[in-house]
Structures are given as C-alpha cells and as structure tokens.
Amino acid sequence: MGCLLFLLLWALLQAWGSAEVPQRLFPLRCLQISSFANSSWTRTDGLAWLGELQTHSWSNDSDTVRSLKPWSQGTFSDQQWETLQHIFRVYRSSFTRDVKEFAKMLRLSYPLELQVSAGCEVHPGNASNNFFHVAFQGKDILSFQGTSWEPTQEAPLWVNLAIQVLNQDKWTRETVQWLLNGTCPQFVSGLLESGKSELEKQVKPKAWLSRGPSPGPGRLLLVCHVSGFYPKPVWVKWMRGEQEQQDTQPGDILPNADETWYLRATLDVAAGEAAGLSCRVKHSSLEGQDIILYWGGSYTSVGLIVLAVLACLLFLLIVGFTSRFKRQTSYQGVL
C-alpha cells in the first residue's frame, strides 16, 4: 500500500510540474528602415511589434501611424495619441534632413541604408528597460545610452564625428530620454491592459511526421512538423524512449498568416535505426500533455498517459482499502 501511495504522489508531481508556464514579457519594438538612393530620393517605413504581435505600421506615403489591432492605442486618449504621432512626424522629417547633412559633411557615398530599432520592456513592479539602436548598411554603429549617444565597438571612425554633433543637440537628447523612460513604459502598460486577452491567448499546435529528401544511401531524414501554435516558445525533439536525440536539427520558427507559428525538426538516421524513434512536442497551451508522435504512425499524449496511470492507481487504492476493510470486518465477526 505504501508503494501505491508513493507512485500516486510521483504521478501527481509529474502532472503538476510539466504544466508550469514561465512568465512572459512583451517588449515593444519599433523598427524603422530608411533608404536614401541619392540626396533627393528617400523613403522611410516603420512598424511596431508587441511581443510576437505586430501592432502598428507606418508607410512612407502616410503621415499617420496605422493601428493594426483594436487595442493598438492602449489606454492613451485621442489627444495623447495625436501628440505622439506629431512627435513621430517631426522625428521622421528631422531624421531625413540630418542624414542628408551628415552624408554631405562626412562625404558618404549613396545609396545609404539605415535601420533603427527602439522600444522598451515593462517588468513586474513597474520596472522597465529600454533600447535605441541605429545600424548603417546593415551594421550597428551607435545607440542611446542613458543620456547620450555612444558608438559601438565596430563603428567606423566617422561615427564619432556624427556623435559629437548629435550630443550637442540637448533638446533631441532630452526628448529621446522622455520617450524611452516615460512615454514608452506608459504606452506599453496600456497595451498590455487593453490587449490582455489576445496577448495571453494559447493556441495548441498540430504535429505530423514526414520523410525528407534522402541524406544518402541507406539513410533517412525524419521530419517532425509543428504548426499553428501560439505563443512562440516551443520545444521539439526527436526521442528514443526518454532519451533526447542530440542530432535533432530544429529549423527557424516561421510565422503563419494567422499569427501562429510553424517549426520543423529533422533527424538524419540510418534506415535500420528509425524504428522506436518518436517526436516529442512541449508547448504551454498543452498544459503538460506533451504530444508524442511515433515514427510509423501512432500518436499519444503524455497527459493522457499520466491520467491513465492516476486512474489505475486510484482503482488499486480503492480495491486495496476495500479488501482490507472486508478482512477486518470478517476478523471481527470471528472474534
């Protein structure tokens, strides 16, 4: 009986432990791409992501930031939102002008490509961190740190001259500080409140197996497809029993059109070693009921196995207690 109680406790711990979901954070990341074909032709486009969801876009042909979600304005009033958009319009105009002036002063050759990544992340307890990075021709050259602009270690020498000029502009530096330290965390907090249901949604993955192109004579490429899951973090491994196959090659996690994700994991094995292999999928939406697909077509779920074990253990406990009670009753009758 003690052994049965131990097994029951173990099964419960397995079920509870596998259902733990780490706390998620949702950084706001604003991305900007600016192209300068020459001194007279320029284009700047932008978009913003909150965690894994795209929330805003800004076309070069528009003066208005487009909201892609019903809750994209967060808890900002219409006046606050319009003020923020006005700041962005001034920023885009100033950015274009300044780049042209720097190109002339530093004798940079067209075409020019600049990328900007800026935003913030709000943590529990209202703590936050922020970032503002600038890349030139695809390579990071400078960032905003605290109260001023600083070059990266790999930045060209001319970046130091540009930073000297930028740091002399006190109004711009103070505006950047205000946006990063105050406005951004406030805006993100409002987005998290307004978009809570969509941000915290859980969509279960679907998984299937296939055979990929042969890696060579006598070998198989086993492919495990996992699609339609949200949020993005997922764990996929080829297994032999409970042993992870370290040669599993996961691909990139790619977006689907419906804002869910797709991943495939491959394993190159000898044809005679494919039997007994399985693909295991862990995701927060499964609540501990991992998907296991066996090479050869069978399917099972760890959660169902745990439930079956629990049911059997409970049945054995009931039978054991009932049998013991009957024996005690019969002994009392004899006495």
UniProtKB/Swiss-Prot annotation:
It is a single-pass type I membrane protein. Residues 20-301 are extracellular. A D-galactosylceramide binds at D98, D169, K170, W171, T172. Its main location: membrane. The chain crosses the membrane at residues 302-322. PROSITE patterns: IG_LIKE (PS50835). It holds the Pfam family C1-set. Residues 323-335 are cytoplasmic. Residues 185-292 form the Ig-like domain. InterPro entries: Ig-like_dom, Ig-like_dom_sf, Ig-like_fold, Ig_C1-set, MHC_class-I_related, MHC_I-like_Ag-recog, MHC_I-like_Ag-recog_sf, MHC_I/II-like_Ag-recog. The keyword 4Fe-4S does not apply. Antigen-presenting protein that binds self and non-self glycolipids and presents them to T-cell receptors on natural killer T-cells. Heterodimer with B2M (beta-2-microglobulin). Interacts with MHC II. This is Antigen-presenting glycoprotein CD1d. It comes from Pan troglodytes.
